[in-house]
Amino acid sequence: MTVTDAPSANPTRRSRTIARVAAVQALFQCEQSGDTAETVISQFIRHRRISSTASFDDGHIPDADLKLFQEIVLGVTRRQDDIDAKLSDVLPEQWPLPRLDPVLRALLRAAVFEIGTDTPDRIIINEYLDVAHGFFSGDEPKMVNGILDTLSRRANDGNV
């Protein structure tokens, strides 16, 4: 990775990465608390510096891309049954969706929601691999890579 490719070198990219991390956290919170996506989004905006602007302020980390954050959280909650079915089709038999760590489940749901959007799948996969490495130190990132790669190939072949 060159300096210009690094997330910190591009404030817009960095704000999108932060939005994805926040979305995974929000989806986890929705599942654990039973709160609606709208309630959790509101809490994140009030308490976790989620805003509609994304710029560096005297070297501080930029805020998350609010639009992307909301799209992911609301999109996943609205399409969760479809997303879960796609995940269940590719998960190893010994790892059904309910058995997965709740953070891993939230991460996969967010990533699957974004696959097939205007953002190239390779970027989505790389972003969520980075997020997975932030949350997990074991084999989970490898699992994320395999699952997302399979779903991306299926989507591009029209088999999803």
From Swiss-Prot:
GO terms for biological process: DNA-templated transcription termination; transcription antitermination. Signal peptide: none annotated. One of its GO terms (cellular component) is cytosol. It holds the Pfam family NusB. SUPFAM superfamilies: NusB-like. Keywords: RNA-binding, Transcription, Transcription antitermination, Transcription regulation. The keyword Transcription regulation applies. GO terms for molecular function: RNA binding. Involved in transcription antitermination. Required for transcription of ribosomal RNA (rRNA) genes. Binds specifically to the boxA antiterminator sequence of the ribosomal RNA (rrn) operons. HAMAP family: NusB. Belongs to the NusB family. This is Transcription antitermination protein NusB. The gene is nusB.
